[in-house]
């Protein structure tokens, strides 16, 4: 089925014209294409029309372009139906269409956001997988002409107390993965000089055999310097800038488009890319300089699929084709076959399109920064991609055929609620013991061990940091705030999802995650402005898994349209599944808000001598809650929300910040009101005394659309009345100060609770 072509390098003709379905399946498996028989038959028909067999490089190119990772073949239909309408707003400059979303920041500047997954590589090699995830997301923002200003990293692992002897075969321990991933993010982000300001870490045994590493980036760009991921016109030159091309990252996207198993590490280690932050830093400077001087017509990063995807996509987006001279590509090693060069995903590479009259100046600037840059091709009028290698034509395909991957409307089964919504949840026999267990649970406990490894202050623009409060008393903040320009206008950044809620009910779990994202932005006095999603799910070929995805997407679209917060960019990561099961549905969200004046941003810790007010409504809703996890109770009613209620309360909260002096604000989320108040107390070592006995449901329910606000006692009643006048619920529930957490129903020493919370994660390290 493979015939070596008579050329002075490795090139094979693959005999598919008369191949049977069994032979097509065998070719796909042997070449690592990860294409179905139907997809191979479509390729077979194309080359029958051409009257020839394809070369190996052509089949490999199609495998990259048609992978789940690159063409979204299982998700496009449902994203278009339920979510893409939520990408529209007057202030959105570019959404969904390119590598990153571009949104108006002020009259002069726009901010750029991108959010991706690097799950499979991190499960195989946690340090390298996480590091190259950071490298890739930086390039997504850079290719829009933006200076990266902040990194975000939601991480998901199996339970840290998993006994080694109970690990499935071929699985790395969650503690090893956690340490490797955190080190990879730390070393890459710190060395390239971009602050890591937000994120989350979540532990659940659905991630035991398939951890998730999601990475996000925010950048800033002058509106007149925004550049797009497309060529300018025929005659433009393709310039490959950055790192050399090697055998690392080959079949990265096809590896990411299949389930993991116990053989994955042995078979797919070469699919993990190797990052180099020391090359990335000058590459960023050089790219921004040529953008500032107006020397480029287009720019795009080399991510999934490498050269095989970037050149065709840039050319076709402008209505043209490409001619490539593959032997001009700088290599890390000799002896690479043309197909390996074409699909390698080696890191730190950018593709630029440049008019011929500007090429010398562009190459000089990259030489000045000591970054390799080479002309590797040109844009041609025909919508065809041709590749030459050492004088031989080895590839010729219609660019539209390569980039028009399949699209499936996969069948799905929507999960039905397991029980009636009205369910009884047992209160704890011992309130204090239960509360201390909740505080020390790794999902609620202090994340200082992780946060302190990241430089969140480099670039000197981080106004609100991930940890807030008095030195040595810091607590978790709701969102970071960045001051990206000389004005006092700022960006608030948060990352949110609750996989436990999504596991119980994907629809209401996703809606609750959106609600929490908005709450976190509002809590720091930011107007919710846009969001990105990173949708992590199992095998889409299984109707139950596809049902989880569809329900989550429906919920996000409903919430986004109703609240008026557009989805500007995103990512879908399927096949997060092994023979031992799929990950919990995990629709990670990256939220961005506008802070009109960073000097008026609000932190989460109690300041003392204040009245504590609960804003919002509490219901008996324990599905996916920390309380139900700690107590081992199966609760099925995930907290409800609605875009109308969320919008009404959010607007009222922001108005109240303008009208009243507000000392502190924190959203009520994991652990409910009790854990929320405890976190606010820990930030300055100030206790809390309830004004009345708070009930079990009030303390531990995780109902949505709630905040705890600290105000001076003198304005407390006026503040609560402000909400009541709008027919919204607000109540003075207590006062800050003292050395105890006294909730009426129970009371604990603040120091004991603080110790339990701060040691909840570190006791496993």
From Swiss-Prot:
Its main location: cytoplasm. Mg(2+) 1 binds at residues 116, 571. Pathway: Purine metabolism; IMP biosynthesis via de novo pathway; 5-amino-1-(5-phospho-D-ribosyl)imidazole from N(2)-formyl-N(1)-(5-phospho-D-ribosyl)glycinamide: step 1/2. GO terms for cellular component: cytoplasm. The keyword Metal-binding applies. It comes from the Archaea. It catalyses: N(2)-formyl-N(1)-(5-phospho-beta-D-ribosyl)glycinamide + L-glutamine + ATP + H2O = 2-formamido-N(1)-(5-O-phospho-beta-D-ribosyl)acetamidine + L-glutamate + ADP + phosphate + H(+). One of its GO terms (molecular function) is phosphoribosylformylglycinamidine synthase activity. The active site is at 69, 118 (proton acceptor). Keywords: ATP-binding, Cytoplasm, Ligase, Magnesium, Metal-binding, Nucleotide-binding, Purine biosynthesis. PANTHER family: PHOSPHORIBOSYLFORMYLGLYCINAMIDINE SYNTHASE SUBUNIT PURL (PTHR43555:SF1). Monomer. Part of the FGAM synthase complex composed of 1 PurL, 1 PurQ and 2 PurS subunits. Belongs to the FGAMS family. Part of the phosphoribosylformylglycinamidine synthase complex involved in the purines biosynthetic pathway. Catalyzes the ATP-dependent conversion of formylglycinamide ribonucleotide (FGAR) and glutamine to yield formylglycinamidine ribonucleotide (FGAM) and glutamate. The FGAM synthase complex is composed of three subunits. PurQ produces an ammonia molecule by converting glutamine to glutamate. PurL transfers the ammonia molecule to FGAR to form FGAM in an ATP-dependent manner. This is Phosphoribosylformylglycinamidine synthase subunit PurL. It comes from Archaeoglobus fulgidus (strain ATCC 49558 / DSM 4304 / JCM 9628 / NBRC 100126 / VC-16). The gene is purL.
